[in-house]
Amino acid sequence: MATVDHREAGQDDPESEDEVYEVVDLTEYARRHQWWSRVFGSNSGPIAEKYSVTTQLVMGGLTGWCAGYLFQRVGKIAATAVGGGFLLLQIANHSGYVQVDWKKVEKDVNKAKKRLKKKANKAVPEINTLIEEATDFIKKNIVLSGGFVGGFLLGLAS
């Protein structure tokens, strides 16, 4: 943080006050005041500073297992719905109920791919900031993150 003394030229009046401005570096402020401090209060911080390694592993493992298990269940339901929809579409097409112009479908899909690639190349700065915050969180809480990944994989397998 720095201060800047601002005086107008030609003002030698003893009654005039010097204006002092405080320059705040917002990037440094944002690094010192993480998002969890704004959400959970000033007593919150990295989990590594509050809990033992064993507690972090158990917390990460349990939350990871729950997330993996739910991801597996929802994924199976979604895959069944999408696959069933394609199967019904093929049966309807084969039976003559539906006529699909596959060349037009392919053309539209390729057009959508090109648009998506163009938009993906123009990364939004907010996404980069979010990725930096997530990476910083993982680095500061590596034990918890490792437990989460292990639990997530176990949840997918169960």
Curated annotation (Swiss-Prot):
Domain of life per record: Eukaryota
InterPro entries registered for this protein in UniProt: FUN14
One cellular component term from this protein's GO annotations in UniProt: mitochondrial outer membrane
One Pfam family linked to the record: FUN14
Principal location listed in the UniProt entry: mitochondrion
Membrane topology field: Multi-pass membrane protein
GO terms classed as biological process: autophagy of mitochondrion; response to hypoxia
Localization per record: Mitochondrion outer membrane
Membrane-spanning segments: 51-70, 77-98
Motif YXXL per record, residues: 21-24
Claim: Transmembrane is one of the keywords in the record: yes
Keywords: Autophagy, Membrane, Mitochondrion, Mitochondrion outer membrane, Transmembrane, Transmembrane helix
Family: Belongs to the FUN14 family.
Protein task: Acts as an activator of hypoxia-induced mitophagy, an important mechanism for mitochondrial quality control.
Name of this chain's protein: FUN14 domain-containing protein 1
Record organism: Tetraodon nigroviridis (Spotted green pufferfish)
Gene from which the chain derives: fundc1
